[in-house]
């Protein structure tokens, strides 16, 4: 039974209301510093911890709760007579409910003007110590680190005579240990990122010790293949616009491959400005098989589907605008695993109501960029900054005698944006705001060029006057010859080959325009 509670919080969301309800249930309130003042100013009877222990706060508040009368009351096992006898001998009442959240260390070090002394002063000592004590003794003590749990605890107390069940206490305790682990991890990340002069400005993006925090969203029936087990975890620092922020409106549970492909589709489609045009991306095995722009979602989908209607079967489709009824009716004619959009109209949802296996994911558009990209290798982890660079037309360098026309420049920019999301080696033919042929994942660039050309022919699409993007430089002129023979009149590529002069000369020989980006988009 909860008779006495200690409340000491940095995040004061809902704390007054929670304390008022505790008081109404007859719970004695202990508190510290600003929390105690807030409760007292709100008319609640509260005892300062310094008065409770008979020992004043000291060292500028560094020592407040580090006292046997606090930790003894938290850690004592109520089922052990010797523990309870020790409390009685030293006149220590039990503390049955602990509500603590910690100094805002992560918010502090995120500030550009943060200094090492600022960071050090925001390392909480007393808070984690109390939290760990209470979580260790969760059989007898209820511990809250998240204001979202206030209502649950109050509900159980009201229903059970001020008692909280073991299952709830256990869940809250595991939440505490996860929270303190993340807190210590953030401190380690920060301290091991500092340069020799320990200045915030000299911080390395890659700390000596890297701690990451993820919460499990779901376990899956299997992984990439049926013999593999799998689960999906959400980054606790997921940025705006990230796939992990999805809300599933309908459909079966997402599989491992669904999520991997959905991420590829969403990252590609949100790279297009929704204010400029509707975009549709169709993904198969993490590669775009059709990408297009249109005046609306339906037009964008129709054009994207035409690129490769065979590969689109059972694919993942993403839009950067609301999916309306017209587009929904067109998509519903095909077999699709997952549909993603910033929103779905009521009429569009009604179209798919009869297709409950289709997964509808709603994700708000956002411009957040992940801090890191990861790739697991045997015994280690490769960490890099995301490939977030979008080349602007003003950055392009025309290296041929012929310059691209305005239409060709638009097609080149579109092709380059798509190529970034195609597995290397990538060759992408585009024209009129749509992909015409995609060659992906080949060991030689010339083979990717041939495949892209063949895909366009199979789809009945002409490549005459098309634009081509290559995610990396042409090592020889052979790849360029293939795309020109297929009908391309302009090419965009990074440049940087020792044979750039030979490739540029070949472009001039063919009379096409070529621009260099100076940026490569390898994708493995």
UniProtKB/Swiss-Prot annotation:
Which protein is depicted?
Answer: Bifunctional purine biosynthesis protein PurH
- Record has Transferase as a keyword: yes
Stated family: Belongs to the PurH family.
Any Pfam family hit: MGS
Per UniProt, the keywords (alphabetical) are: Hydrolase, Multifunctional enzyme, Purine biosynthesis, Transferase
Pathway stated in the Swiss-Prot or TrEMBL entry: Purine metabolism; IMP biosynthesis via de novo pathway; 5-formamido-1-(5-phospho-D-ribosyl)imidazole-4-carboxamide from 5-amino-1-(5-phospho-D-ribosyl)imidazole-4-carboxamide (10-formyl THF route): step 1/1; Purine metabolism; IMP biosynthesis via de novo pathway; IMP from 5-formamido-1-(5-phospho-D-ribosyl)imidazole-4-carboxamide: step 1/1
Gene3D superfamilies, alphabetized: 3.40.140.20, Methylglyoxal synthase-like domain (3.40.50.1380)
Q: Which domain of life is it from?
A: Bacteria
Cysteine pairs forming cystine bridges in this chain are none
Ranges where the MGS-like domain occurs: 1-145
- Supply the InterPro entries for this chain: AICAR_Tfase_dup_dom_sf, Cytidine_deaminase-like, MGS-like_dom, MGS-like_dom_sf, PurH-like
Q: Which reaction does it catalyse?
A: (6R)-10-formyltetrahydrofolate + 5-amino-1-(5-phospho-beta-D-ribosyl)imidazole-4-carboxamide = 5-formamido-1-(5-phospho-D-ribosyl)imidazole-4-carboxamide + (6S)-5,6,7,8-tetrahydrofolate; IMP + H2O = 5-formamido-1-(5-phospho-D-ribosyl)imidazole-4-carboxamide
UniProt domain comment? The IMP cyclohydrolase activity resides in the N-terminal region.
List the gene name.
purH
Q: What is its EC number?
A: 2.1.2.3, 3.5.4.10
List GO terms (cellular component aspect).
cytosol
């Amino acid at each position: 039974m909860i008779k006495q509670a200690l409340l000491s919080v940095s995040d004061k969301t809902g704390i007054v209301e929670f304390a008022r309800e505790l008081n109404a249930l007859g719970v004695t309130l202990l508190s510290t510093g600003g929390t105690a003042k807030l409760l007292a100013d709100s008319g609640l009877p509260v005892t300062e911890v310094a008065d409770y222990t008979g020992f004043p706060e000291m060292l500028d508040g560094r020592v407040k709760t580090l006292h046997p009368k606090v930790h003894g009351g938290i850690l004592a096992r109520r089922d052990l007579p010797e523990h309870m006898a020790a409390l009685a001998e030293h006149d220590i009442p039990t503390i049955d409910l602990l509500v603590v959240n910690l100094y805002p260390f992560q918010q502090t070090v995120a500030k550009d003007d943060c200094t090492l002394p600022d960071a050090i002063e925001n390392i909480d000592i007393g808070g984690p110590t109390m939290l760990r004590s209470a979580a260790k003794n969760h059989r007898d003590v209820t511990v809250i680190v998240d204001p979202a749990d206030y209502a649950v605890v109050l509900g159980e107390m009201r229903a059970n005579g001020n008692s909280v069940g073991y299952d709830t206490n256990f869940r809250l305790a595991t939440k505490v240990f996860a929270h303190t682990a993340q807190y210590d991890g953030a401190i380690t990340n920060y301290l091991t990122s500092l340069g020799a002069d320990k200045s915030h400005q000299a911080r390395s993006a890659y700390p000596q010790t890297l701690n990451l925090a993820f919460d499990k969203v779901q376990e899956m029936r299997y992984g990439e293949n049926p013999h593999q087990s799998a689960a999906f975890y959400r980054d606790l620092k997921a940025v705006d616009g990230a796939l992990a922020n999805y809300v599933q409106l309908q459909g079966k549970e997402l599989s491992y491959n669904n999520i991997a492909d959905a991420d590829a589709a969403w990252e590609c489609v949100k790279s297009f400005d929704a204010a400029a045009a509707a975009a549709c991306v169709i993904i198969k095995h993490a590669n775009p098989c059709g990408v297009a722009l249109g005046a609306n979602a339906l037009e964008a989908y129709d054009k994207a589907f035409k690129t490769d209607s065979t590969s689109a079967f059972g694919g993942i489709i993403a839009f950067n605008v609301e999916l309306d009824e017209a587009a929904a009716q067109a998509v519903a004619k095909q077999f699709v695993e997952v549909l993603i959009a910033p929103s779905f109209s009521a009429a569009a949802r009604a179209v798919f109501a009869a297709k409950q296996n289709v997964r509808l994911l709603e994700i708000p558009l956002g411009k957040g960029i992940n801090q890191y990209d990861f790739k697991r290798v045997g015994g280690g982890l490769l960490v890099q900054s995301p490939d977030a660079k979008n080349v602007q037309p003003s950055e392009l360098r025309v290296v041929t005698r012929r310059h691209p026309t305005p239409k060709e420049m638009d097609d080149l920019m579109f092709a380059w944006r798509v190529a970034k999301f195609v597995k290397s080696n990538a060759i992408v033919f585009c024209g009129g705001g749509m992909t015409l042929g995609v060659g992906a994942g080949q060991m030689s660039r010339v083979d990717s060029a041939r495949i892209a050309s063949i895909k366009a022919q199979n789809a009945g699409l002409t490549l005459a006057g098309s634009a081509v993007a290559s995610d990396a430089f042409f090592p020889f002129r052979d790849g360029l010859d293939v795309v020109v023979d297929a009908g391309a009149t302009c090419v965009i590529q990074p440049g940087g080959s020792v044979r750039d002069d030979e490739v540029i000369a070949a472009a001039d020989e063919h009379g096409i325009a070529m621009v260099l980006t100076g940026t490569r988009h390898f994708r493995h």
